[in-house]
From Swiss-Prot:
Pfam families: dsDNA_bind. NCBIfam families: PRK04239.1. One of its GO terms (molecular function) is DNA binding. This is DNA-binding protein MmarC5_1518. Belongs to the PDCD5 family. Residues 1-12 have a biased composition (Basic and acidic residues). Residues 1-35 are annotated as: Disordered. It comes from Methanococcus maripaludis (strain C5 / ATCC BAA-1333). Keywords: DNA-binding. GO terms for cellular component: cytosol.
Length: 118
């Protein structure tokens, strides 16, 4: 077999696999999307209750810049609010301090390089 035939065969196999996965159960995919939407709506409702307007806008800006960090912050806020450890509504100043603490906890360890000269 020449390399072109091998590439064609692999391409066909990959396309067949993608079609099988896509056509497996569209109903299950639709339900998963619905559940995801429900989850997001509920999360936004809780965040509206616990954050002030300024804090919400700050979180929205963070979400644009660092979506993964914002998701982590949202989960932390929800957990703390459910445990009753947050003042409601959360002011922007308090939120800034909380962001600093969360960032410090999740920041990778700073590596130091020392050069020894002989």
């Amino acid at each position: 077999m020449n390399p072109e035939e091998i590439r064609q065969r692999r391409l066909q196999e990959m396309q067949a696999k993608a079609q099988e996965q896509g056509a497996e159960d569209p109903e299950a995919q639709r339900q998963a999307q619905e559940q995801q939407m429900q989850y997001e709506m509920q999360k936004q409702k809780i965040l509206r209750q616990i954050l002030s307007e300024d804090a919400r806008s700050r979180l929205a800006r963070i979400k644009l810049a660092k979506p993964q960090f914002a998701e982590h912050v949202e989960m932390q806020l929800i957990q703390l609010a459910q445990a009753g450890k947050l003042p409601v509504p959360l002011t922007d100043e308090y939120f800034k301090g909380l962001l600093d603490r969360i960032y410090e906890m999740n920041r990778p360890a700073k590596k130091e390089i020392t050069i020894m000269r002989k």
